[in-house]
Structures are given as C-alpha cells and as structure tokens.
Amino acid sequence: MKPVIWLIGGTSEGRALIKAMADLDVKLFVSVATEYGAELIEAQDNLTIMAERMDLAKMRQFLQEHKPTCVIDATH
C-alpha cells in the first residue's frame, strides 16, 4: 500500500512541495480553501485536490477515512 500524504496548502511553497512529490510513489491529498487555490495546482497522477474550508470536524473525518502517514501544513 502506498503511503498517504495530506498537504494542507494554499501557498506558493505548498505548490512547490506538490511538484517535488510528483514522481514519488505516494497518494497525495491536497486541501486548499478555495476553487481558485485548486486551479493554481497542476494535475499529477498521484494527486487528489480538495477545495473547501475544513473545520475541525471535517479534518478529523478526513484523518479517520484516509489515515495519512504524514500531514504537511503549508498554509500561511
């Protein structure tokens, strides 16, 4: 099973991290607050983009459902 990474993004640094992980054998989930933020991210095979503001309950739900190996906070 591939490692699961959740990157909480919305910054240019987050987009750079996403590009850096393009060739890794991981399942990468990226959450951004807006559709505009999602549009700035280039598609890649191992990437799922979620465009919505996540409150604590939604974050907990995501963690329980996907069980990420690693969480990266690349927000402001």
State what each model feature region is.
Residues 8, 31, 73-74:
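Structural motif
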Residues 4, 39-41:
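Eukaryote-specific long, low-complexity intrinsically disordered regions
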Residues 1-27:
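A short, flexible N-terminal coil/short beta segment enriched in small residues
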Residues 24, 42-45:
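Short, structured coil segments at secondary-structure junctions
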Residues 60-76:
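Glycine/small-residue-rich loop that forms an oxyanion/phosphate-binding "nest" at active or ligand-binding sites
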Residues 44-64:
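Glycine-rich, highly charged phosphate/nucleotide-binding loops
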Residues 6-7, 47-52, 76:
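Short, flexible loop segments at the rims of nucleotide/cofactor-binding pockets, characterized by
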Residues 32-38:
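Short, polar loop motifs at secondary-structure junctions
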